[in-house]
Amino acid sequence: MRRGWSSLSDVPTASGPELEYWRRLLAVGPLPARILIISDAWLPQVNGVVRTLQTVVAELHAMGHTVEVVGPDRFLTLPCPTYPDIRLSVAPGRQLNRIIESFAPDALHIATEGPLGQAARGWALRRGCAFTTAFHTRFPEYVNARIGLPTRWLYAWLRRFHNAGQGMMVATQSLRDEMTERGFRQLRPWSRGVDLDLFRPLPACTWNLPRPIFTYVGRVSVEKNIGAFLNLDLPGSKVVVGGGPQLAAQRRTHPAVHFTGPRYGAELAAAYAGSDVFVFPSLTDTFGLVILEALACGTPVAAFDVTGPRDVLADAAGCIGAIGPDLRAAAMAALKADRAACRAHAERFSWRACAEAFLSHLVPLGGHTP
């Protein structure tokens, strides 16, 4: 699907089911479509994948499209090994087949590579249907950090998974470059947005703690490299907002750190806005929505120079934060950043633009369905 097409003459060469797809879309106005998204990450999980899908779906609904997300909540599930808060679907194939065929989508997007993603991919390949995928999470690095499985094995599997589709969406240019080198094909840029009404500078001070206040927001787990933040020798106070499998252990190990547990909505925005620097220690995130949320609240960012921070901060890093190999040096440098510039930079990222980019990369389902 491509924005700006208003008649069949604008559509690339198509025939059969694909031509009928475009004819039906264009006959009823500005590209209304039935879009089915399959995701192993969905409510009640709280993470960047879920937040991205939730917001994009809301934007697509506002644009007049019919969108449904199929997540693990519809299936028998078991807890994920080493991370019981995440539930994985068990043998979802037949039930998922019925859901897909009942919904009769114009376009199929497979957001994750778990049991649901694998089942949806199998359904599409058996019927000769086209689909798109997305690379949200560095599972090879996550699995390696937890059980030591070599990342090259998992990337080989992921490459086969994604290359069977008609396009893999990636959040940043540096991730696109990396995945191209790893042999992934048909990569499509799909950036992210931020809720500028919720996440904004606030006058009230949230924290009654010694300044400066350095804050981390996110999952308290090994793959987030949170130890790199907790072990920093910094002045003032360190705050951790979020839950996760390492929360209890880290509380015991770092009694001087202020752990709040998870916060949402206005409370989360206040946590960002009341901080002097947002510290993002992750080495494996593919984007980092929390970076944008902090910037939208006027809070500068300190991070390693890796995919995600490198792309979001880009050439403005000196004004809105700092990135580099030394996280402590970056955190101290970020104290000098311009909070107004942080907000202005975040305003460049729109969820509507994110949804439009997603829409532009979808492909007609085609194939043969019962």
Label for each model-derived stretch:
Residues A248-A266:
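Nucleotide-activated donor-binding/catalytic signature segment of Leloir-type glycosyltransferases, i.e.
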Residues A314-P325, A331-K336:
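Conserved acidic donor-binding segment of nucleotide-sugar-dependent glycosyltransferases
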Residues P300-A303:
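Short hydrophobic beta-strand element within catalytic cores of glycosyltransferases
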Residues I100, H162, P262-R263, A270-S275, ...:
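Short alpha-helical donor nucleotide-sugar binding micro-motif in glycosyltransferases
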Residues L283:
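Aromatic "clamp/platform" in nucleotide-sugar-dependent glycosyltransferases that forms part
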Residues T206-V241:
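Conserved donor-binding/catalytic core segment of Leloir-type glycosyltransferases
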Residues A156-L202:
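Donor nucleotide-sugar binding/catalytic pocket of nucleotide-sugar-dependent glycosyltransferases
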Residues K336-P364, P370:
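A charged, aromatic-enriched C-terminal amphipathic alpha-helix characteristic of glycosyltransferases
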